[in-house]
């Protein structure tokens, strides 16, 4: 077996590397080239090239495409740029805006991985005769240890917990996992940068991207209102007890758990508890109204060895769950019953927003297996807050 778990020599193994123009994917290309693989670099142009030319660190546009090209020249490998602007707009940007209109807080990186990167680019890699598509994500994949699944691979958290990207990859399908490779899963970020300098790559000291790649300076409201003007329609700010406290200029400016910038002064600390998109109401309440031990999921992607129904019916499936990208996995139980698919959290959370993800794991540590996860459809609050919210949502809205 070679280092990518193929039963042939590296020079007989073609690998397409998804190159964003950042240090991680560049080092992946360099490592595979050093190991003797037949490497091709592909960069996807995902949004307005002209608008992004002078924006560094934006990923997959402008300067980043040029950086990827220069890295490939240094490494002596072919580099191709594919125009996926239309596809990216249809599958990532438009759903991002629609999600905000629906009162959710979306994660566009998951949608991008689900569609453009791990579906479209993966198909292109296969058309080019590649044995695998490699990326710079910090996650590990290995052959599935179960004898009942020969030839299959499984996902595991990376060695560098601070760079763990498994939360954003919960929706990766089994077919995609079998084809993908993640060479940086066992490395700390500091080692990745050291390797980039050792290879003489122009991106060795390039800063990591921080914002959503297609949102300049984090001003997502500008993009949303351009695509969905009704997202900026005014509405009421209402307390859980029914009091109208003020007005707002669009639910897109709010997210569950928000305290600052609500635009009202009441003398009591209030948080955004719910976004009633249908009636354009921002519902606020005390911090305890955000607390939950149960989240309901939609679009569940299950990566366990038995079926989801087999695992989660009855007493449920004991696992660890992560409802925020920055949190460590915490004890939980996955259930399926007549009410839907849901996760009971042993340790309660607060401010969980619909549209975010819940990733599932075998254990809390850095070698935990990833069991998939789902998008959060709703959370069930503590009984008193849940009753107040249901009563408020059922009440008529003033014209």
UniProtKB/Swiss-Prot annotation:
Keywords: ATP-binding, Cytoplasm, Disulfide bond, Nucleotide-binding, RNA-binding, Transferase, tRNA processing, tRNA-binding. The active site is at residues 112, 213. CDD domains: MnmA_TRMU-like. It is found in: Cytoplasm. The keyword Nucleotide-binding applies. Catalyzes the 2-thiolation of uridine at the wobble position (U34) of tRNA, leading to the formation of s(2)U34. HAMAP family: tRNA_thiouridyl_MnmA. This is tRNA-specific 2-thiouridylase MnmA. It comes from Rhizobium leguminosarum bv. trifolii (strain WSM2304).
